[in-house]
Amino acid sequence: MIVGIGTDIVDVRRIQRSLTRFGERFTDKVLCAGERRSLTGSRLAAYLARQFSAKEAVSKALGTGMRGGVHFRNIEIDRKESGAPLVRLTGEAKSRAEELGISDIHICMSDERDYAIAYVIATNGV
């Protein structure tokens, strides 16, 4: 059964401006350690925009957004062997998911030159 749905779209140019202004402080705020290992220089802003939109979409599916103790670094977007995105939760995000009985988080991510979008469906396995 669907417990929550979230979506988010991010302008890659806005992320580039944040990178220019804040540099590593911005990446440290948004990314988990595992995600930072996947950083690449040539498409850094696009990668960050995808991660940012995915994390926002997950937080919306949890019904909190980025508040109530849920932070960007509580949501990790990794990849399965197949290349499909995989969501890992820690801290308050994990607690909120457990409170809602969420067992699976399905995520779809896409991007074009100027925009990144993510769509999330959180289910309880029923």
What are the language-model segments listed below?
Residues 1-126:
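Core catalytic alpha/beta fold that binds nucleotide/phospho-ligands
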